[in-house]
Amino acid sequence: MDAAIQYILYFAVLVVLAVPLGRFMAHIMDGEHTFLSPVIAPVERGVYRLLRIDAAEQMGCRRYLASVLVFSGIGLVTLVALQALQSFLPGNPQHLPGVSWDLSFNTAASFITNTNWQSYSDETTLSYLVQFMGLTVQNFVSAGTGIAVMFALIRGFRQVKEQGLGSFWVDLTRTVLYVLIPLNLVFGICLAAGGVISNFQPAQKAELVEPVAVQPNADGGWSVIDGAQIEGDTVKVDGKVVEGARVVTEQFLPQGPAAPQVAIKQSGTNGGGFFGVNSAHPYENPSAFTNIIEMTSLLLIPAACCFAFGIGVKNTKQGKAIFAAMFILLVIFTGIIAVNEHAGTPQLADGGAVNIEMTDGQAGGNMEGKESRFGIASSSTWSAFTTAASNGSVNSMHDSYTPLGGFVQMLQIALGEVVFGGVGCGLYGMIGFAILTVFIAGLMVGRTPEFLGKKIEPGEMRWAVVLCLATPFAILVCSAIACMVPGLADQLNNGGAHGFSEALYAFTSCGGNNGSAFAGMNCNIPWINVMLGLEMLFARFMPIIGTLAIAGSLAKKGKVAESAGTLSTTNGMFVFLLVFIVLLIGALSFFPALALGPVAEFFQMIA
């Protein structure tokens, strides 16, 4: 019962907060007066004067796209330079060295694309300056870019025989100033009050209560020695000295300005953690209070985008229909993960090896890789939310989920981040599927497809296909190439079906702009870093190109009057068709690959 209440609470809070935020975002898009205008409007005008931005400019789709690409390219080069020059810059109390060229490129590509894939452990790789001047800035502007492109698409549907889609620079400025900064100021204060650390102190060392004996392992790291007898600096097991063993007496305690960066990495669907284990770290997510704030903020803006879309196109029912389709998919996927994690596995229950019964004192089920302070309900919901969005943050280890739990995580990402997805990009990704749906429905009834009063013709259909298939293409092609490289197996912690799942998840995560990982694959080698970086760039900007092409084409068209034969795109039937098409495309694209990974592992588990 407690678990059921948690699931209901998380979904209810999301819906209640998303509706007013969506209404607010629609006002921001059109530059209307809001309760924040007296404070922020002077700053907005100052930014326009400083950067010589024409607030009244109307860009065509090509100029809008060029602005997006140039802005992102500048961010890529700047972030690579910051990492390479890290050792010469201030704000580096740990005196960390510069980052290698391949990891710098991978990280820069990851953060400008809103993916936040991390082939490194933050606290031992990047300085405070690089984190808050490089990564955090990109967390804001990459999220703002996605919302700006969504605004352009809305104007494409709304305009009648016009060329302009608005100004990218104005849309980006308004999004950052009115939405992202105020929202994350509130979230950051709440997280800091809840115990998330926020300082600029160097890492601290603390004495352990008891010393621990470790020895080198095959992976180049250290493993704890079971049954060790420590006598000074000497380690013995059963009376015999262990050669090469080391006695650890101190613990490394990372510090840093985590709270404000955690806020934007959640609300901007960025996902890159301040610490290596992300929001499973007690410094980043210490309690149930911070957990619900971080989990709610994770999907808040993507959900609000649905309502902003409805208001923006002057058809609130359409926004609600898109939201309903996304919400239904999310509930289904969350339910599948939750049922499998609460049930555990036959191997855990075999002969009473592990007590998987739910009691007042324990969560039961499959608790491997999960934090006891969160349990299965909060962990399962987070994993569903973070893979539905293009977020990728974690409060548990996805590599330790049951086979079907991992299957759902990968499937949600592989669908093309359309189950709410990233800020802005999730909405325009789902619109691509909506256009595909009305096209198929139009074929069935013999009518030219229409959507929101605009005829959908071959030009829009070609770009809608690009929008829907860019992510599957990137994931499957890159995964296939990687699997043909002989050295890939050496980078995996496991073999067989689960080893394949680890590799497939990595390329799925980067192709879906998600950033989460099974963490069973060493990706910090040059060829993998470069391949993943290129995949992230392709999977981010091809859908943007398709979206702006559709927006530009629709803006030039006139409105078509509704008739008795016009397909309604706001009723339950359309919602059902949209959900069906999303699942159909996902199944046709990915089931063969998923069958070799998590599905095969599931049948091995129950055999």
Where would I find each of the regions flagged by the language model?
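Membrane-proximal intracellular helices of multi-pass ion channels
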Residues: 1-607
